[in-house]
UniProtKB/Swiss-Prot annotation:
UniProt-annotated binding residues for xanthine: L20, N27, K156
Protein task: Converts the preformed base xanthine, a product of nucleic acid breakdown, to xanthosine 5'-monophosphate (XMP), so it can be reused for RNA or DNA synthesis.
Protein name per UniProt: Xanthine phosphoribosyltransferase
GO annotation, biological process: purine ribonucleoside salvage; xanthine metabolic process; XMP salvage
UniProt source species: Deinococcus radiodurans (strain ATCC 13939 / DSM 20539 / JCM 16871 / CCUG 27074 / LMG 4051 / NBRC 15346 / NCIMB 9279 / VKM B-1422 / R1)
Reaction catalysed by this enzyme: XMP + diphosphate = xanthine + 5-phospho-alpha-D-ribose 1-diphosphate
Database matches in InterPro entries: PRibTrfase_dom, PRTase-like, Pur/Pyrimidine_PRTase, Xanthine_PRibTrfase
Upper classification of the organism: Bacteria, Thermotogati, Deinococcota, Deinococci, Deinococcales
Length: 193
C-alpha cells in the first residue's frame, strides 16, 4: 500500500533496541483516511475467502481490524489482555510474548463470539516474529473455527515471522514491508506482499 509506505518513510523512526516507532500512524494516533484504506485493501484481499469474522488483539490491531470488518460486512472480535468480570466463564485463552510490554500477556476470547461455525481472518498491526499471530491462531483452533488468513499492517521481514507461520498453511498479506532498519541507516520500506 503505497500511501502507507510513504507515511512510514515520512514519520517512522528507529528507536534503540530495534523498535520501530510508528505510533503517529497505527499505535497511538490514527489517520482515518489511511486506516480506512488499510481496511479496504485487506477486505479486497480476503473477501474471496468468505470470512464470517475478523479477529485481532487489543489495542493497536482494533482500528485496521474494524475497518476491514466493516468493508467485509462481518463482526470483529478482539482478544482481551485481561479477562473482565463480565466475560462469560467459557473462554479461549493463549499466551503471547510482547516485546513492547516486556513480558508475556494472556489473551482471552469469549466462546460467545467465536466458534466452529466461524471462518476467521486475523488482522493485526505488526508481523515480526509471529508470536502474537501464532497465539491468535491457537485461540481459533481451540474454538473449532477455521483460520482463513493473516493480515498485518507492517511486516518486519528480517524477524522471520512469515517463515515461522508457514505451517499454518494460510495466506499472509501485509501492507508495508520493513526490509531492514537501523538507527544509522533509518528505515528501508517497500510495499507489502
Amino acid at each position: 500500500m503505497q500511501s502507507l509506505v510513504e507515511a512510514i518513510k515520512r514519520e517512522g523512526r528507529v528507536l534503540p533496541g530495534g523498535f520501530l516507532k510508528v505510533d503517529g500512524l497505527v499505535n497511538h494516533q490514527l489517520h482515518p483516511a489511511l486506516t480506512r484504506e488499510m481496511g479496504e485493501t485487506f477486505a479486497r484481499h480476503f473477501a474471496p475467502l468468505a470470512p464470517t469474522k475478523v479477529l485481532t488483539i487489543e489495542v493497536s490491531g482494533i482500528a485496521p481490524a474494524i475497518m476491514t470488518a466493516a468493508e467485509l460486512g462481518v463482526p470483529m472480535v478482539y482478544a482481551r489482555k485481561k479477562k473482565p468480570l463480565t466475560m462469560s466463564e467459557q473462554v479461549y485463552t493463549a499466551q503471547s510474548v510482547s516485546r513492547t510490554k516486556g513480558g508475556t500477556v494472556d489473551l482471552f476470547v469469549s466462546s460467545e463470539y467465536l466458534g466452529p461455525q466461524d471462518r476467521v481472518v486475523v488482522i493485526d498491526d505488526f508481523l515480526a516474529s509471529g508470536g502474537t499471530l501464532r497465539s491468535l491462531s491457537q485461540i481459533i483452533a481451540d474454538s473449532g473455527a477455521t483460520l482463513l488468513g493473516l493480515g498485518c499492517v507492517i511486516e518486519k521481514e528480517f524477524e522471520g515471522g512469515r517463515q515461522h507461520l508457514a505451517d499454518l498453511n494460510v495466506p499472509i498479506h501485509t501492507l508495508a514491508n520493513i526490509v531492514r532498519m537501523s538507527e544509522e541507516e533509518g528505515i528501508v520500506v517497500q510495499a507489502g506482499r
